[in-house]
Amino acid sequence: MRFEGRVALVSGAASGIGRATALRLAREGASLGALDRNEAGLSQTLREIEALGGKGAVFPCDVSESGAVARAVTASERALGPVDVLANVAGIGDTAGAEGIEDLHDERWALVLAVNLTGPFLLCRAVLPGMAERGRGAVVNVSSLAGRSKSANAGPAYSASKAGLLGLTRHLAYDYGRRGVRVNAICPGGVDTPMIRAAGVSQAPSPEEAELRRKRIEAYRYFMPIPRLSSPEEQAAAIAFLASDEASYINGVALDVNGGLYMA
């Protein structure tokens, strides 16, 4: 197994790509530290890890808060050992400003950047020095097609946060590559997750909102070269590859996992 004897820390592990990544890495032998604000979702992820025969621990954490991140990483390393793999998956979608930047308020801009960009920065800052000291490690950041171009559904805060994450990825890849640590990113497009299904509709959607949701998901097949949404597991497979020794000479890359929606 590719991650036997290694410790992986995954943010956003309560659902979607984060949960799929946690399960994939645990299935391949990693001891898994799972971070998220959603404690019920974390508990479910842990149950699924244990059902696989894996080892895991959960650490409720708001990744946008410096102190919370420091405490969570310390607790994880105390429970599982030093972090060998970090997957920064936690993120929030946002439609504010999608129709015009005048609709994007200061507070929403700050929140989206805090979760999607500051969160990965805080986690990288917490684990990279230890990885460098040990001379090995891998970080995979989940950016987005929106960071490459723009989002068809989200607003400018989301696009800016994901573009910034690509810049952070490249900078850290250069700084830490010579110390045995690789830093890469993936750029998903449409992924069948709770976040994309909830975009633009309320928690208890009306029949009209439910129909809007159905039409949005259906629309992907008309403009994507591979005419469907990705599964979270397909994204997790890409993350696992970049984190593994099979990708030992891949560093500073933004891997498009979006069905050909963005072609560079």
Each model region followed by its residue ranges:
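Short, small/polar-rich loop/turn modules that mediate ligand/substrate recognition or access, typified
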Residues: G177, R182, I250-G252
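Substrate-binding pocket helix/loop in short-chain dehydrogenase/reductase
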Residues: G97-I101, H105-A110, Y220
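Canonical Rossmann dinucleotide-binding motif of NAD(H)/NADP(H)-dependent dehydrogenases/reductases
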Residues: F3-G33
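Active-site helix of classical SDR
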Residues: C124, S161, T169
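Alpha-helical segment proximal to the catalytic Tyr-Lys
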Residues: P129, Y174-D175, S248
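Short C-terminal tail/terminal secondary-structure segment
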Residues: A98, A240, N251-A264
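Residue(s) in the substrate-gating loop at a strand-loop-helix junction
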Residues: S144
